[in-house]
Amino acid sequence: MDPFHNGNKRSSISFGSSQRQPYNKNNYLSGTNGPSSAAQDQGRGPSPFGMSGNTTNGGNSKRNSGCDLSATYYASRSPMYSPLDFSPPVFSPNHSQLQQARGYAANIPVVSNLMNPSMASVCEYQSHYPLFGLDWSADDYVCLGSYKEDSRNKLQVLHSNDLLSWESVVDADVVYPVSKIQWVPSQLYPRKLATCSDSLRIWSVSPEERQFQEQINLSLCKYNRQHPANPAAADDMKVIGTFPPITSFDWNTVDTNLIISSSIDTTCIVWDLQSSHYVKTQLIAHDSEVFDVRFLTKSTQLFASCGGDGSVRVFDLRSLAHSTIIYEPPSSSVSGATAGTITPSSKGSDALLRLEPSPYDPNVLATFAADSNKIIILDMRNPESPILNLQGHGSSVNGIKWHPTKRNVLLSCGDDCQVLYWDLNSSFMEINAAGSKSPSIHGTSLEDPDGDTEMTDGGAGSGLNEDPLSLNNNSKQVCKTLETPNMMYANKTQEINNIAWRPQRGDWFGCVSGKKFQNVRVL
């Protein structure tokens, strides 16, 4: 969602303004006759964050009904993350959801569908609030974050013993909707999670004692360090509302004292929770807003970011004077921008919204752009050009997650009310057969046949060969497009805003749409 562009398209990932536009590609859930009716937000609506740090949520919106039945529609929007749209999904009036799914993808197994509950196991929890934020812990606690236009948002923790019913065990009030939630990796006790919105916060969670408390506001600590003569209190929203909002963050899985965050002010910050100053380093990462940042797999030194300039960049904390651009949009519109100058991404831009490094091959990353139904698979051994494009969604992609235990399996969700399951191993085998450097289909990188990842960051295996920022760009290859997923899950009523795998085994995934959280067994 883009907290800095007023707008009322609240589904998927934007605070941005919304316009209905023809989208010609067939999707699994819409017939050729188009939708029968729609209630789509067209006006300019409130934004949780003002450009100048205003914390008020003023604004009006209007609704228009009716649509042209000659085409399928999707909603265009500017980047970042905003979850909610209560308008009906784009379905043909003459076919059921399941029929349409089978009609457009007869060979795709349905993971589960609420119209036929016997096909698979689905459990749902109905919240009182529209939902966007989502993460699943190792001991089956799920944290949900609301998205409301006023200043009364919630964090809610659910728990289930059998994954067939969920109980709300504790919640906390927040002012602004969170754009990301993450439980601390590989740690059950004490339970902690982080969230980002106006600030980056660490929370302490004790369901047994019914306690959910903010432990530290890292953005506020940074501010008070810079203003020792006039520090701000934890509840001083007049000050906190002026901070550059945090668009995303990532908790390092090797050293959980390290967190990296991205912001709309073009910077990324590496935080050290053991340091008295908390800020380890801050750098200008892009020429415009930075929308996501992630540590590369098994590394404490290497990280990648994406942003409004449409590029993916790789950094090494040991040498921040240089970075490597591993992907740029085919026609870059930001070539004239100066580093450190904020260039807000415009509607229809190539802004990349989310980045997902593979948990098994640190050379491989997935990303997607604003207003796009395409997922881009990148390999740092073949920079600048994607190795694979996934175009199975019928509307804009909202989220992507690699499977936690299965190699080269990706989950995606979108405005077409679908979750798609992609097994990319066969596609990578075809790339391998073509003789290009490409992702491994086994347990290690292709350039590491003995199973040993090279050590490039002081003991943590990064999996990158030699200098990770000295990439070989000699072998160009034609990017393959994959349009048919292996499995799909169709939500009957609303766009799917976010997804998360059950981290232990990946036998279930969770998704949020509207006010509903669902967990679905993957057969």
Swiss-Prot record:
Lineage: Eukaryota, Fungi, Dikarya, Ascomycota, Saccharomycotina
Other known facts: Present with 799 molecules/cell in log phase SD medium.
Keywords: Cytoplasm, Nucleus, Phosphoprotein, Repeat, WD repeat
Composition bias, Polar residues: 9-40
Residues with PTM Phosphoserine: 47, 65
Residue stretches of biased makeup (Low complexity): 52-64
UniProt record similarity statement: Belongs to the WD repeat WDR68 family.
GO cellular component: cytoplasm; nucleus
Gene3D superfamilies (UniProt xref): YVTN repeat-like/Quinoprotein amine dehydrogenase
Organism per entry: Saccharomyces cerevisiae (strain ATCC 204508 / S288c) (Baker's yeast)
Name of the molecule in the record: WD repeat-containing protein YPL247C
Chief location of this protein within or outside the cell: cytoplasm
InterPro entries with a match to the protein in the record: DCAF7-like (IPR045159), WD40/YVTN_repeat-like_dom_sf (IPR015943), WD40_repeat_dom_sf (IPR036322), WD40_rpt (IPR001680)
First and last residues of every WD repeat: 173-213, 241-281, 285-325, 392-432
UniProt region (Disordered), positions on chain: 1-64, 436-472
Compartments in which it is found: Cytoplasm; Nucleus
